[in-house]
UniProtKB/Swiss-Prot annotation:
Family: Belongs to the major facilitator superfamily. Sugar transporter (TC 2.A.1.1) family.
Localization (cell): Membrane
Species this protein is from: Arabidopsis thaliana
GO molecular function annotation: monosaccharide transmembrane transporter activity; symporter activity
Role according to the record: Mediates an active uptake of hexoses, probably by sugar/hydrogen symport.
Topology term for the membrane: Multi-pass membrane protein
Protein name: Sugar transport protein 12
Key words of the record: Membrane, Sugar transport, Symport, Transmembrane, Transmembrane helix, Transport
């Protein structure tokens, strides 16, 4: 290949390339990594409402639920041990994401996906055959280790493999897989709840999505970015040519090598994140995943059956309602695949925030009007139940085409290569910290804040929408290695990012 002069600056650069069948299939297979995360989110809440599961592992919760059926509905499921069962996974995911950063950088994205699948598979088997609470907890920890690795590697893999014009749509495949996993889990919970040992099938069924990503990672190629990072220049060149479906890849391969050479000068990527020029990246790595969880979505998806049961639905009706929200989740995520590269990230963030705000206030008013502050139960009229489910579905739809997919897409596409693995690790870690905290205290918050819990999350939706409006630049249609120019042109972040244009010549 001849030497090529590459200008990296504020001028927009367009790399040639097509949306080939090869890259589409590759990204679909990789996106399946989201199935394990989604399946766990959906299965946990449903299993905890099954009488046979409660009787075996959490008898105090079961007895309290049956004994106090006519008392405060807000506090029926308030149990430290029950919430620890759900939230312990996220502490494990937090720890493993830090290790996954090193593995992803040194050994490639696909190795991290493979480890994630194997660990999740082991946890699923242990949970399926559990006979004591400690087996459940250890199984949950293994599941968490697996999720930490996949959530670290899959979004990066998708952003690096996809042509920049289609990066948003292909990356959202990860979130779509999460929503499909949630839906499948809710459907299985509904059917398995009829069987006395159905909880074993629900928990053990996690082996299936684990095997999908495990086998998938064995046949997937690694990304050209990762190959170059590990010195495999010729292999990366051949792979990029196959991925893009064109021979003219000189500009893109040179920019990838420039980014790789810059990354090698960084001895301590974690410490480097604290440098002034990476201030916008670090801010987004922390606040976007934190805000994603403060929308309250995982409260709905974790505990949808518990929540619906709490507000007066029967056990079967609660699981059916959870299936309905799961269907909405999948459908709205498909909308985001269409719209993210057409309407842009900022539009979806802001529209979704407004829609979530209205829905949360409406749900709070509906639940508050029915149960008041003392949680006095009563028979929920059918029309009233439909109204509650309708607004929850509107809320889920808003999240599913905004903060759901974009909470993973935007961080994975804005980090330069030299800090990419470390910054993505922070994104996953913050996501898991907030997921753990909210999952751990949700039932207690429901007991004390009552319907005000939805107002609590609505407040943060307002805060995050203001943040997006003021501080998040549009990243649609910007090549991943050219992302620095969006910070240079931003009214605030330009103060931190070096505005000088660099002219670099690289000879391969």
């Amino acid at each position: 290949m001849p030497s090529v002069g590459i200008v990296i600056g504020d001028g927009k650069k367009e790399y040639p390339g097509k949306l080939t069948l090869y890259v589409t299939v590759t990204c679909i297979v990789a996106a399946m990594g989201g199935l394990i995360f989604g399946y766990d989110i959906g299965i946990s809440g449903g299993v905890t409402t099954m009488d046979s599961f409660q009787q075996k592992f959490f008898p105090s919760v079961y007895e309290k639920q049956k004994k106090d059926h006519d008392s405060n509905q807000y506090c029926r499921f308030d149990s430290v041990s029950l919430t620890l069962f759900t939230s312990s996974l996220y502490l494990a995911a937090l720890c493993s994401s830090l290790v996954a950063s090193y593995v992803t950088r040194q050994f490639g994205r696909k190795i991290s996906m493979l480890l994630g699948g194997v660990l999740f598979c082991a946890g699923a088997l242990l949970n399926g055959f559990a006979t004591a609470v400690w087996m459940l907890i250890v199984g949950r920890l293994l599941l968490g280790f697996g999720i930490g690795f996949t959530n670290q590697s899959v979004p990066l893999y998708l952003s690096e493999m996809a042509p920049y014009k289609y990066r948003g749509a292909l990356n959202i495949g990860f979130q779509l897989s999460i929503t499909i996993g949630i839906l499948v889990a809710n459907v299985l919970n509904f059917f398995f709840s009829k069987i006395s040992w159905g909880w074993r099938l629900s928990l053990g069924g996690a082996v299936v999505p684990a095997l999908i990503i495990t086998v998938g990672s064995l046949i997937l190629p690694d990304t050209p970015n990762s190959m170059i990072e590990r010195g495999q220049f010729r292999l990366a060149e051949a792979k990029l040519r196959k991925i893009r479906g064109v021979d003219d890849i000189d500009d893109e391969i040179n920019d990838l090598i420039i980014a790789s050479e810059a990354s090698k000068l960084v001895e301590h990527p974690w410490r480097n994140l604290l440098q002034r020029k990476y201030r916008p990246h670090l801010t987004m790595a922390i606040l976007i995943p934190a805000f994603q969880q403060l929308t309250g979505i995982n409260v709905i998806m974790f505990y949808a059956p518990v929540l619906f049961q709490t507000i007066g639905f029967g056990s079967d009706a609660a699981l059916i309602s959870a299936v309905v929200t799961g269907l909405v989740n999948v459908g709205a995520t498909v909308v985001s695949i269409y719209g993210v590269d057409k309407w842009g990230r900022r539009f979806l963030f802001l529209e979704g925030g407004f829609q979530m705000l209205i829905s949360q206030v409406a749900v709070a008013a509906a639940i508050g009007a029915k149960f008041g502050v003392d949680g006095t139960p009563g028979v929920l009229p059918k029309w009233y139940a439909i109204v509650v489910v309708l607004f929850i579905c509107i809320y889920v739809a808003a999240f599913a085409w905004s903060w759901g997919p974009l909470g993973w897409l935007v961080p994975s596409e804005i980090f330069p290569l030299e800090i990419r693995s470390a910054a993505q690790s922070i994104t996953v870690s913050v996501n898991m910290i907030f997921t753990f905290l909210i999952a751990q205290v949700f039932l207690m918050m429901l007991c004390h804040l009552k319907f005000g819990l939805f107002i609590f999350f609505a407040f943060f939706v307002v805060v995050m929408s203001i943040f997006v409006y003021l501080f998040l630049p549009e990243t649609r249609g910007v090549p991943i290695e050219e992302m620095n120019r969006v910070w240079r042109s931003h009214w605030y972040w330009s103060k931190f990012v070096d505005a000088e244009k660099n002219l670099t010549k690289v000879v391969i």
